[in-house]
A protein has these predicted regions:
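Conserved double-stranded beta-helix
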Residues: 1-55
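Aromatic-acidic/polar surface patches that form glycan- and anion
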Residues: 7, 32, 98, 102-107, ...
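Short edge-strand/loop segments of extracellular domains
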Residues: 8-10, 56-63, 137-144
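Short histidine-centered beta-strand/loop micro-motifs
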Residues: 17-20, 25-30, 104-105, 123-127, ...
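Histidine- and/or cysteine-centered catalytic micro-motif in compact active-site loops
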Residues: 21-23, 42-46, 58-60, 68, ...
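Short, conserved beta-strand element in jelly-roll/cupin
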Residues: 26-48, 84, 105-108, 113, ...
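Double-stranded beta-helix
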Residues: 48-118
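Non-heme Fe(II)/2-oxoglutarate
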Residues: 68-72, 108-113, 117-168
Length: 168
């Protein structure tokens, strides 16, 4: 479905607010169901103090929809700071109390596989230690992207690949 690098330089790496990737992929890419997984591979050490990815284990069982239409070209700003499609503080608090919060830490080369619908986010990196991860996202060939559910047009192909041909 997509590949991206998340780079958080030392002292100025911006965090990413709590969200479910599937909510965006459903609303803006037209992904019908949460039949995708992400693999985050640490390119640098991921410490508890340099903006490491936080996840709420088990939260993938609950879909938290965003209300309303997605603004045109939302992807131009949402990949830096997501403001549309994020859950309310009440929903986040409820999920955190029910599921807890774990953090992905480890040396470069460590990997975390997680469900497309899991609630996750990261804090700012105010340390001198950069944190970089590559994300590889795999969607089921039986879950081909359709027209977006809440956007006027799909995101560009370089953000959300629409070819559902199986890899051979």
């Amino acid at each position: 479905h997509q590949t991206r690098i998340n780079y958080m330089p030392g002292f100025k790496g911006s965090g990413f607010y709590w969200h479910s990737d599937f909510e965006t992929w459903h609303a803006e890419d037209g992904m019908p169901a949460p039949r995708a997984v992400s693999c985050s591979i640490a390119l640098t050490p991921n410490f508890a103090y340099n903006g490491g990815l936080m996840v709420m284990p088990g939260s993938h069982r609950t879909f938290v929809p965003s209300l309303g239409e997605t603004p045109e070209d939302n992807h131009k700003s949402s990949l830096k700071e997501q403001k549309i499609g994020v859950p309310s503080e009440e929903v986040i608090a409820d999920m955190a109390h029910r599921h807890g919060i774990d953090q992905f830490t480890g040396p470069a080369g460590s990997a975390l596989w997680f469900d497309a619908n899991i609630m996750h986010g990261s804090g700012n990196n105010i340390t001198p230690f950069p944190r970089s991860n590559i994300f590889l996202v795999f969607n089921s060939v039986d879950n081909a992207l359709q027209d977006p559910y809440a956007a006027t047009a799909p995101r560009p192909d370089y953000i959300a690949h629409r070819n559902a041909e199986p890899l051979r």
